[in-house]
């Protein structure tokens, strides 16, 4: 087994990885920016190295500084978490060339799935339904307009190298197209260093469904699906498993096709294949070659530690799991707790946390890195922790989540806890009568 793992991340996911390593007796190295010196992940790790200033480009995205930290601490593996360099093919390639284990996908597969056009082509070749749209990148406006007329408005313009809702524009009518096309290209260049965009048919009322997989050279297994349809501006707020809208027949087809594609491309590690689902049909969206923020809901229903499985696959090249081992039980829900004021258009709320009481109890889990006196800075993602509740069924999971949200106290900053209370008690959520555009259309706060 690995002797020492460097965690190239911060916050709750760094703490989550350190906990998994500790259970296996693996030494850990935390890296941190100057403002994260007193953070929980730094306190919990066996060693820590400051890798730069608070700007992500100078620290958590600084590959030379990370490589120096790896050399300095003699780490034999790196876990990237999610975000930052977790899907950076160049970083994975540098580690491969230096014979340092990357606890994630190979640079080849990161690059393959990071190019959304290539990923769509591969998915289609391997039997997954894809969304109607351009065959590749689109540069000519006249050709783009013709394509839009063919598939019909509304359409979605997306950055080829993108994700997270950036470089993505919905065009409802032809008169808007030129302006939004230019804006999408500019955003794609700004966020991803590549202005290539592609066009797809826009679905008005879809659900967001994703399949968790674990793949070794010996076997590929799926850990069933997650429903991530409660979103605001393409950012997930609540995730759950199983999805309340899928039946067993659709699940079987979805899982078989997903496993087939992942097997065919020779993928290894943890991964998530995302789909949109509407009117009884699913369509490939993208594949994330890393652990997802929402992985705990899958862990709660399957009893499988996804982080440990990632580490084991990276070490041995194989997964110890068989599909018959995966027997989900009950229902799990996750709420992302962000340092934002939902009543003020989700304005960020940095500050120092005062009193902090985190809920506990039967089948209740908090993944976080906050404590009394912790400073929430404006430099990184606003999520401060995740609350996950498990029940025998969806009704019990909702009841447990409501109880846990009532118990959760974070003073000194404004959080999205009040928003989650409203969402969990809303009849649309209770009846599972919603889609990804629910919060963009309805006024909840």
Which residues make up each language-model segment?
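ATP-binding N-terminal substructure of ATP-dependent carboxylate-amine bond-forming enzymes
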Residues: 1-126, 138-146
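Catalytic core of soluble alpha/beta enzymes
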Residues: 141-143, 147, 206, 328
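Acidic/histidine-enriched active-site and ligand-binding environments that engage anionic O-linkages
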Residues: 147-156
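ATP-dependent carboxylate activation and anion-phosphoryl transfer catalytic cores
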Residues: 7-26, 48, 71-73, 104, ...
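N-terminal nucleotide-binding beta1-loop-alpha1 segment
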Residues: 159
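Conserved beta3 strand of the protein kinase N-lobe
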Residues: 133-134
